[in-house]
């Protein structure tokens, strides 16, 4: 039981009409409320190599299957690279690109808990715009590479707020050396 009104309701884009429209009508009539949920979050469709993911096509893949070849942080970054409301395409390119980005960004890993500046957080406050947040991390990386210490600190803080940098720098480097999953599941 969710109550008469609640904060967030989520579902796939395919459920907006008629399912969610009917759900709203029924809930509002049953409870006499002005709204059912304060926020609606509809995720985009998932494809694999630009084809609809389905068991009948034989291209259905689970996160556990992907984790056999990629660290959980790589998978997380790949997923966050597309806005939740847009279609997401699982493919090797996005996973490899995400791994390469993490390899670069870990150079500026800090185990200190630094407060993230609003200018770096504002993207998440705008409809969880993770692709823009990641674009900003790329900019922070460029500045950090040229010696800007504040950018290095903000890069680390920005990655952490996205649930990245779940391993310490040494563990990530060791992971790179062996080329297979050796990290524990924490932070994945």
What does each of the following model-derived ranges do?
Residues 1-114:
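Alpha-helical recognition segments enriched in aromatics with Gly/Pro capping
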Residues 29, 65-68, 77, 100, ...:
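Charged/polar, solvent-exposed surface patches and flexible loops
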């Amino acid at each position: 039981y969710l109550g008469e009104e609640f904060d967030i309701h989520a579902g796939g884009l395919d459920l907006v009409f008629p399912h969610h429209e009917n759900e709203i009508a029924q809930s509002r009539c049953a409870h006499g409320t002005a709204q059912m949920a304060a926020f609606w979050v509809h995720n985009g469709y998932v494809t694999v190599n630009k084809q609809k993911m389905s068991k009948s096509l034989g291209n259905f893949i689970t996160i556990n299957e992907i984790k056999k070849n990629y660290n959980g942080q790589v998978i997380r970054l790949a997923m966050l690279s597309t806005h939740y409301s847009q279609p997401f395409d699982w493919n090797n390119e996005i996973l490899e690109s995400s791994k390469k980005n993490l390899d670069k960004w870990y150079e500026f890993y800090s185990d200190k808990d630094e407060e993230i500046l609003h200018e770096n957080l504002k993207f998440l406050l705008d409809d969880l715009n993770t692709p823009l947040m990641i674009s900003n991390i790329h900019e922070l990386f460029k500045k950090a590479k040229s010696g800007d210490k504040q950018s290095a600190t903000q890069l680390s803080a920005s990655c952490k707020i996205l649930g990245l940098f779940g391993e310490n720098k040494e563990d990530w480097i060791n992971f790179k050396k062996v080329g297979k999953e050796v990290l524990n599941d924490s932070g994945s």
